[in-house]
Amino acid sequence: MEESPPKQKSNTKVAQHEGQQDLNTTRHMNVELKHRPKLERHLKLGMIPVVYMKQREEILYPAQSLKEENLIQNFTSLPLLQKLCPKDPENMVRKSWASCIPEEGGHMINIQDLFGPNIGTQKEPQLVIIEGAAGIGKSTLARLVKRAWKEGQLYRDHFQHVFFFSCRELAQCKKLSLAELIAQGQEVPTAPINQILSHPEKLLFILDGIDEPAWVLADQNPELCLHWSQRQPVHTLLGSLLGKSILPEAFFLLTTRTTALQKFIPSLPMPCQVEVLGFSGIEWENYFYKYFANQRHAITAFMMVESNPVLLTLCEVPWVCWLVCTCLKKQMKQGRVLSLKSQTTTALCLKYLSLTIPDKHRRTQVKALCSLAAEGIWKRRTLFSESDLCKQGLDEDAVATFLKTGVLQKQASSLSYSFAHLCLQEFFAAISCILEDSEERHGNMEMDRIVETLVERYGRQNLFEAPTVRFLFGLLGKEGVKGMEKLFSCSLPGKTKLKLLWHILGKSQPHQPPCLGLLHCLYENQDMELLTHVMHDLQGTIVPGPNDIAHTVLQTNVKQLVVQTDMELMVATFCIQFYCHVRTLQLNMEKQQGYALTSPRMVLYRWTPITNASWEILFYNLKFTRNLEGLDLSGNSLRYSVVQSLCNTLRYPGCQLKTLWLVKCGLTSRYCSLLASVLSAHSSLTELYLQLNDLGDDGVRMLCEGLRNPVCNLSILWLDLSSLSAQVITELRTLEEKNPKLYIRSIWMPHMMVPTENMDEEAILTTFKQQRQESGDKPMEILGTEEDFWGPTGPVATELVDRVRNLYRVQLPMAGSYHCPSTGLHFVVTRAVTIEIEFCAWSQFLDKTPLQQSHMVVGPLFDIKAEQGAVTAVYLPHFVSLKDTEASTFDFKVTHFQEHGSRNAR
């Protein structure tokens, strides 16, 4: 802690050993970039070699060297999601899919807004919890807050004193007084303790890694007011501070993994939750320039990673980005050709081991290191003494090697050792589980012990969220086993690894919807057989039976999943392809409704911006679609480059997508050349939906060129014809005549309506009218219109009688079944008949019945008039998506109001 010092510039220092690089990404890059465009051109022309001789380079900077003039600039683009506190803390961690539309998760904020008014309450929070996945950058953010305050750029008016504590170091202390705690949070004593405590509302305590120690932060005695000099157990002192027994006016900033939130939220008063989402956009590239002091090396490394969408997505996690840079730098120093084909974090860690640890240490010393890591994970320890290292059999030579390579690091404030990152410790712990289990003398008992230890450490509900478990899945995959056998010169029996995986799967919480954590584990494993088997077994918890699918009004065939990051998007789309009961994938920004209303599908929601990188990884995974047949991107505004990438995917031989929805995506005539290239290729696409886009005559003519190609497989094309010229419509009609398999439609697609209890009784009618008006009311004469009824003789035009009354008339020419896709109405008639259809307001009738007290309006009201006896059946449309999956068709009533005022409800 320091008190309002003047701004001062800091110096850049080089780490003592080549691998001891701070994972913090906060130092200003003191590098001139004026030659970068030239270097990029040289790289593209092959003028700069990719094979490197060993060179001495400056190592990645410690956090202390951050230059203040660029500090806030680092914060500006850091993706932070401020969240609403969940009503049910039990379910706050699990990101599982469900049958209802998920509630909005919050909104994006800047670092300056951490202590601003909270969502909903509009009150400034005293407690802010920074949460996020392992290695996502929470500690870095916490250090940056302290540093920015010190440099006078952040919260200077808000706080007079800021204290930073590493909880892993605090855990080494048994007892502390408040005065001693504050002294530990100061780099240099700046004021007497009485003066500091005189204004508690000006104090900020930053507790980094509050979840790491095995603490129970309970306020032991809320009524007890201790003197600042009285010593007590550290966890009791922190519990009293957080419980507001001590310094109730003080402010707190906590960092924790998302999976640990459950044990904090119920006991903490009104916390503001902020999730760190990792690197975004330009930050990936910036990190490479911060890591590599040599500009040429930075450009070469980044361009190699940028060409691999999977590797680039993995770099969204700062810790993984460090891992990638470290591997590439090792290859440069060893004079190797740059090559990094890893598809998972586990594979990257194995690559890191092979490049970092000398062969002579792998068999014995690395095993000892793994045992040390595992013991620490089970006992919630991240700091180790020299005696701990000796106890595991680590000799001085090995420890020196691990320090030099950066696997271990020595704490400057003590004689303790730690792994370079907690994730790295968890990786070594996972290796320890497998190496121990591979010993024949242990057998099933050892396997049971390992799984029970994992459950005890992480809990059943969060088992798949634990990095150690994810690493286990990765190491037990085919590539993981191959890598371990090569590294440790051992053989891992196939039966053993399969048994361990199924033990873990069997110990997870039963009858729970599948969560993103499980998908992460399956992604790390990459075993096609396991993926197919597990995703098939999820049928009972995900997919309803055939009867439910038939009742599309209930939307039980739709599963919703929120993906906030590109990493989550990559994992979800990769795994969903192996789920044979989902045929369509839909990506929605916020709560924009899609248009694929019938096929069983998975809807991915995203409250955070969808970037070019997001689209790239989505389309990359769809190159091999397996079970997926449809893709619905309706409602998302698509840039030209995005559609270009999509079309490249559709032309890929492994892509088997048959149906594509691009309704209301902001497409213009410029995009049609891209779509035409897909139609001209031998693609699997058979249905294309392009309504509510401004394609124009020129755009549709380009589509016609693609449709004329003999290899075009398209059979259904949906367009808006009302804005097209008669000449273009004639071209479309000619195409249909020449190709009997081609069916061109111009229909209005109704949105689903989500009823709420406070919905006005005429709201649905208003919405229904507005949606119809978007398509235009003027009937078309060619190819059918939004208002046509389709029957035995083809389309039958609908006549607008009275626009004010919303009264329409249709003359059905003969007996048969007639269906209007626009409204959803369906008539069965015995003879030629004229039918009048009027859209009415529910208030005209509901006010006279008790129904308005017990039921909600969930669909439109029609006044249908026809000659008696001519109409034998009327099928009404449904426009409802239920929030509660427990509802059934018995909860619905179709009400008929007869001429004399009576009603019939069933």
UniProtKB/Swiss-Prot annotation:
Summed up, the tissue specificity of this protein is: Expressed in macrophages.
- InterPro entries attached here? FIIND_dom, LRR_dom_sf, NACHT_NTPase, NLRP_HD2, NLRP_innate_immun_reg, NOD1/2_WH, P-loop_NTPase
UniProt KW Repeat keyword: yes
Q: Where are the LRR repeats?
A: 627-647, 684-704
Q: Which residue intervals make up region (Disordered)?
A: 1-22
User: Could you tell me the superkingdom of the organism this chain comes from?
Assistant: Eukaryota
Q: Which UniProt keywords apply?
A: ATP-binding, Cytoplasm, Leucine-rich repeat, Nucleotide-binding, Repeat
Q: Cross-referenced Gene3D superfamilies, in alphabetical order?
A: P-loop containing nucleotide triphosphate hydrolases (3.40.50.300), Ribonuclease Inhibitor (3.80.10.10)
Q: Which Pfam families match?
A: FIIND, NACHT, NLRC4_HD2, NOD2_WH
Q: Which residues form the NACHT domain?
A: 126-435
Single biological process term from Gene Ontology: pyroptotic inflammatory response
SMART domains the record matches: LRR_RI (SM00368)
Q: What is its main location?
A: cytoplasm
Location comes to:
Cytoplasm; Cytoplasm, Cytosol
Ranges where the FIIND (incomplete) domain occurs: 789-906
Give GO MF terms, alphabetically.
Answer: ATP binding
Q: Which SUPFAM superfamilies match?
A: P-loop containing nucleoside triphosphate hydrolases, RNI-like
Question: What's a GO cellular component annotated to this UniProt protein?
Answer: cytosol
Query: Which residues participate in ATP binding?
Result: G132, A133, A134, G135, I136, G137, K138, S139
Q: Please verify whether the record's keywords include Cytoplasm.
A: yes
More details: Three tandem Nrlp1 paralogs, Nrlp1a, Nrlp1b and Nrlp1c, have been identified. Nlrp1c is predicted to be a pseudogene.
Query: Which PANTHER family does the entry mention?
Result: NACHT, LRR AND PYD DOMAINS-CONTAINING PROTEIN 12, NACHT, LRR AND PYD DOMAINS-CONTAINING PROTEIN 14
Its function, per the record, reads: Probable inactive allele of Nlrp1b, which lacks a CARD domain, suggesting that it is not able to form an inflammasome. Contrary to Nlrp1b allele 1, allele 4 is not activated by B.anthracis lethal toxin and no other activation signal is reported.
State the family named in the UniProt similarity comment for this chain. Answer: Belongs to the NLRP family.
Free-text note on domains in this protein's UniProt record:
Contrary to Nlrp1b alleles 1, 2, 3 and 5, allele 4 is missing a CARD domain, which has been shown in other alleles to be involved in the interaction with CASP1 and CASP4/CASP11. It is thus unclear if this allele is able to promote inflammasome assembly. The FIIND (domain with function to find) region may be involved in homomerization, but not in CASP1-binding. In allele 4, the FIIND region is truncated and hence does not contain the activating cleavage reported for allele 1. Consequently, it may not undergo autocatalytic cleavage in this region.
Q: Any idea what this protein is called?
A: NACHT, LRR and PYD domains-containing protein 1b allele 4
Q: What is the lineage of its organism?
A: Eukaryota, Metazoa, Chordata, Craniata, Vertebrata
